[in-house]
Amino acid sequence: MSDTPQSPAQDSLAEHDEARPMRTVKSFVMRAGRMTEGQQRGLDLGWPKFGLELSDEVQDFDAIFGRQAPRTFEIGFGMGHSTLEMAAAAPDIDFIGVEVHKPGVGALLNGLLTQGLGNVRVYSCDALEVLRHCVADASLDRLLLFFPDPWHKKRHHKRRIVQPEFAELVRRKLKVGGVLHMATDWEPYAEHMLDVMSAAPGYRNQAEDGRFVPRPQERPVTKFERRGERLGHGVWDLKFERVD
């Protein structure tokens, strides 16, 4: 074990991680990671300003953001590059991002401080718990799930976040007309997503052919996607609209 003391922000993040009961099957794995100076700055200075704690009560996001605005919920923002790009391009939209990887949380928070953005709030915990407990039903305009872990091995498929229960939870939280936008670079997972969502009640596939949509302009291209394109790899986008 390290003898390095934790920062106050790390203590705050750890408190709610330890206080919550664990779900039986997680769609993610907690990874240890070293903090850069910028990421630590983000946690120390950005968490008190932009960080939110998991609660058992539905949150008033109008009060939290200080306005009424279209609301986007992002599951697993990684290092936050896409979130920053989307938030900067759409200052009239409020973003709620959730990520369990602390260096990624620190990186996004540092970016918010550096760019002076105020339309993003951040959770560092299980996104499904945030949806269940903190987000009001029929309150989200969009939910983004970009490049989730595909859990390639068959015995791990139960860990995939996109399951019938996930589809129903998201449907409840989206407004009628709200959209679930997913993207993956693993074709078998894309087919799995399509199968699950096509069978889920209350949704309409926005793809003209009933399968995948062309890459939407509003989704930033990641460095991994650019590398994949050079190698001839594909990316599949799915958009399902809540209709009921």
UniProtKB/Swiss-Prot annotation:
Reactions listed under catalytic activity: guanosine(46) in tRNA + S-adenosyl-L-methionine = N(7)-methylguanosine(46) in tRNA + S-adenosyl-L-homocysteine
Any single GO BP term: tRNA methylation
Record: active site: D149
GO cellular component: tRNA methyltransferase complex
Segments for region (Disordered): 1-20
Disulfide bond annotation, renumbered to this chain: none
Enzyme class: transferase
Pfam families with a match to the protein in the record: Methyltransf_4
Pathway(s) it belongs to: tRNA modification; N(7)-methylguanine-tRNA biosynthesis
Binding-site residues, S-adenosyl-L-methionine: E74, E99, D126, D149
Bias type Polar residues, positions: 1-10
Top-rank lineage group of the source organism: Bacteria
EC number: 2.1.1.33
Ligand binding (substrate): K153, D185, T222, K223, F224, E225
Record's keyword terms, sorted: Methyltransferase, S-adenosyl-L-methionine, Transferase, tRNA processing
Coiled coil: none
Single GO MF descriptor: tRNA (guanine(46)-N7)-methyltransferase activity
Function: Catalyzes the formation of N(7)-methylguanine at position 46 (m7G46) in tRNA.
Record-stated family: Belongs to the class I-like SAM-binding methyltransferase superfamily. TrmB family.
Name listed for the protein in its UniProt record: tRNA (guanine-N(7)-)-methyltransferase
Organism: Pseudomonas aeruginosa (strain ATCC 15692 / DSM 22644 / CIP 104116 / JCM 14847 / LMG 12228 / 1C / PRS 101 / PAO1)
